[in-house]
Design a protein with these regions (language model features):
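N-terminal pre-domain/capping segments
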Residues: 1-103, 135, 173, 212, ...
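Acidic/histidine-rich catalytic cores of soluble enzymes
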Residues: 2, 31, 37, 125, ...
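A short, acidic, flexible beta-alpha connecting loop/helix-capping segment that sits on the rim
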Residues: 10, 249-266
Length: 282
């Protein structure tokens, strides 16, 4: 497995070249970029990013030998499962845009977030809408040939790994699978069990750590990697058994305000290295 970090973990004021330099120097093997709202940060992609801008980012990636491993986004909201067709169309356009950027930057996958459950949209309807939103552009996804990872987030959509498996299996595509977020299930479950059940469906992995107050469903807080309730040896073992050999992408924030950006990146890279090395301790 290799070490990656999401660009959200880098201070918003840092430009693309400075970010690539710092992340590489810290010891990472790759980076995940994000499509955000206009001017969200000095290193965000936007829906309006030009070919010239993407070409410049690709040059930086090659200059620092730091591959762009995936394209995430903050723009999904509840669009994919919305009752409004125009919102679902917006979600489809975003997926296609992510795939286009991934193709230009050499990334091997993108992250998408199905959902839409609300007071006005039942879970069943949000699920049906989300499936249709993705299914209707499945041909485009397969033509581009880049992995689309469905992520588990705190939106009450995937409450068990079986929910996630069934959703992915119904889409029935070699290019659609799980973007599994280890930390997002810790409040109510154990990530190693999700990994065992999702198995080979997992194509991308986000890592962060969550400290339970007192067992599951007791609340808690986000903490530094290796400081929470995740049983990392079991997680790494489960990933290994599932055949996962890709990037572990840290999606984390500084918990120490006195820490510099360089210190933070170096710390996270070291934590990831320790996690990956747990393969040999099992």
């Amino acid at each position: 497995m290799k070490k990656s970090i999401n660009a959200w973990s880098v201070d918003k004021s840092i430009c693309f070249e400075d970010m690539f330099c710092r992340v590489k120097t810290a010891g990472f093997d790759g980076i995940e970029l994000n499509i955000d709202s206009e001017d969200n940060s000095a290193h965000s992609l936007a829906l309006s990013s030009s070919k010239k801008q993407l070409d410049e980012i690709k040059i930086l990636s090659e200059k620092y030998n730091l591959p762009v491993v995936s394209i995430s986004t903050s723009l999904f909201g509840s669009n994919m499962g919305s009752a409004q067709q125009h919102e679902r169309k917006t979600a489809q356009s975003l997926i296609i845009k992510q795939l286009e950027y991934a193709e230009k930057l050499g990334a091997t996958g993108i992250l998408i977030v199905p959902g839409g459950l609300s007071e006005n949209v039942s879970l069943q309807k949000a699920r049906e809408n989300s499936l249709k939103t993705i299914s209707d552009i499945k041909t485009e996804i397969e033509d581009i040939g880049i992995f689309v990872g469905v992520e588990n987030v705190w939106n009450r959509f995937f409450m068990s790994p079986y929910d996630m498996c069934r959703f992915i299996d119904e889409l029935d595509s070699a290019y659609i699978g799980a973007y599994f977020d280890v930390g997002n299930v810790v409040e109510f479950s154990d990530p190693e069990n999700w990994i065992e059940i999702l198995g080979g469906r997992i194509g991308k992995v986000h890592v962060k750590d969550f400290k339970r107050r007192n067992g599951v469903y007791s609340g808690g807080e986000w903490v530094d990697l290796l400081s929470g309730s995740v049983n990392w040896p079991k997680v790494v073992s489960a990933l290994k058994i599932a055949g996962f050999t890709g990037y572990l992408t840290a999606e984390v924030e500084k918990t120490n305000p006195l820490q510099t950006q360089n210190e933070f990146c170096t710390m996270v890279a070291s934590e990831l290295e320790n996690i990956i090395c747990m393969e040999d301790e099992i």
